Amino acid sequence: MKINKTNAARLLDKAKITYELIPYEVDEKDLSAVHVAASLGENIEQVFKTLVLHGDKSGYFVCVIPGEHEVDLKLAAKASGNKKCDLIPMKELLPLTGYIRGGCSPIGMKKHFPTYIHETCRHFPYIYISAGVRGLQIKTAPEDLIHEAKAEICVLFAE
């Protein structure tokens, strides 16, 4: 089966970053990272989801967290220099990022937004992120993702 390269994959190629494109079966009724991890047969702690938020001071920013967790809005606000923040409404995701729910990658959005990745990403030799479409994940080293996304490592949920 031929896998079409996504914008995120092309940007990783351009940056000479090693990665794998891993397809999985999409369930339109369950777009969760938990489903993705189960489909891949991988540890949910290594399958990260991308969330877009809006802060009261900084505007839009991106949080990347392990799939089974929910972002702590107070911690996200603190990390991003805001007093408060909230997830953006779903209807804003595509026009803002170029991505849809279940296929939002921290790499290759229409515009670069400040990006924050939960610190546990460094516990693993590789993690999974969306490749920018439903049904396709990027498997890459966390340090490569941090570098390419120009991300800061921080705590985004209480463990």
Label every PLM stretch briefly.
Residues M1-E159:
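Extended, low-hydrophobicity, polar/charged segments
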